[in-house]
Every structure is written in C-alpha cells, then in structure tokens.
Amino acid sequence: LQDQVAQDQASGAAGFFKAIADNKDNSESLREDAQTAYEIVSGTYNSEYGKEPSWYAQRVHLGAKNDATSIEEMKNVLPYLPKVNEARTSHNRSVLGISLTDMAVAMIDADYQTGWLDHPDSLYQSENLTTYMQEPVQSWMQEEETWNEMVKEHPEYADVLNSSYNIYAFFANHYNEYLQVGHFLNLMNPELTHFGMGRLDDSAVSWDVNDVLDVSNPLSVEAYTDLFNKYSKDVLKEDQLNTLKANVATANQNLVAAQNAVKSAQN
C-alpha cells in the first residue's frame, strides 16, 4: 500500500489532471482544460497556440518533493485561491474561477524561479510573482497605494483599469510606472474570468492567466478545492493507511499482552 502511495504521489499534478481528463462524467470543456493542463505539466504541450518552454526539463521535476507540481505544494496553494477573489470583490470586481490550464502554467512558472524572480518565456498572458509566501495576494495589492498616487498626478490614467486593452497599453507606453503597479493592475483586470496559482517550496508563488486556452466554464474556487482534496485523499490513501497503522498498533499490543501472559504463567 505504501509503495502504491509513493507511486501515485510521484505523478503529482499530472496524475490529478489526467484523472479529470479521463473521467467521461466530466464536461467536455473541463476535460479539455484538464488535458491541456496535463500536457503542460508533463512537458508535452505543443499546438498552434504555443509549445512547452525550452527550460522545462531543467526546472520542472514532476511530482518531486517541494516541486510546484507535487501534491504537497498543490495543497499549499489552496489557501491563496480565495484571497484573489476577496481582493477583487472588495474592489467591485467579478469573482474568478479556476482554470486547470492556468494552474499548470502557474506551476511550471513557479518552478522556473530559482534564487530570483524572473518572468520566463512561457504560456501566460498575465503573470504575477512574489517571494511573500504567507500573503502573496496581499503583497501584490500593496501596490494599490502607489497606483492611487499615480492617478492623482496623472488623471488621464483613470481609465486604465477599464479594460485589458487599457492595461496592456499602459504597460507598453508607461513601462517604468507599470513596474511599480503591474501586479495590482493584473489582479484588478475587469475582463478576467479565471486564473491559476503555483508555489515552489518556500521560494516563490506565481499567479497566472494562460494564453493558450479560452476556458469558458472555469471551476469555482470551492469546486476546485473539493476536487483536489478528494483526489489528494485518494492518492495519499489516508483512510487505508490510518487503518493499517491502527491494525499494526493493535497487533503489537496483543503481542505484548500475550508475551506478558506467558511470562506470568512461567513464573
């Protein structure tokens, strides 16, 4: 049983995405999203919209301990997800769903971060990175104060947050200013409908919106969390292992009791 657990854990995110893609009870759109995510974390993605980055083999260690694609790191990301929507709804922005493709892109891009933060040549349309592991979303939202000051000094910036196009135009035309507030602008983009996040051990957190698949029906954060927790519990076989450990403990107790009984009889 423990060998099977180790084998299932080793497949990491790939096993999770493949299980969803192969489940015919899931919607066609969810299965497509999962299949794309599977190919991305497995290093096999190649389509007219893009292909696996050249650095994949050097940076991604699928399912390995502390890798962003490991079951443990996927679990560590879960508390971050609702924080994104809390930040958005507090600013009258829509709630975002979870795209499995976004999650996959975020995972491999988190893996790219080794010692410093760097936006890799990858499959994202929009990306935030941080080393603040406890409150990554809050670290990006802190740029709001700087943005508000910018708008006071430049009233013409007031319409930047009205559309994705305006945000991109601000990036293209005011790059130095964008570097100071881009994370906040990305999170507040009014046209977003989905996102994903990844975490590399204690090194970096990534937030991504992919550039390869238009996900029309993303999972809610709650639905994704439930889906992952169920898979994780099945993969880790927690119930079976706990039963096994309890049986071993009981057997050991019975053995000790029997040995003590024999000693008492001999005396």
Spans of features found by a protein language model:
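Extended aliphatic helical segments
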Residues: 5, 20, 41, 60, ...
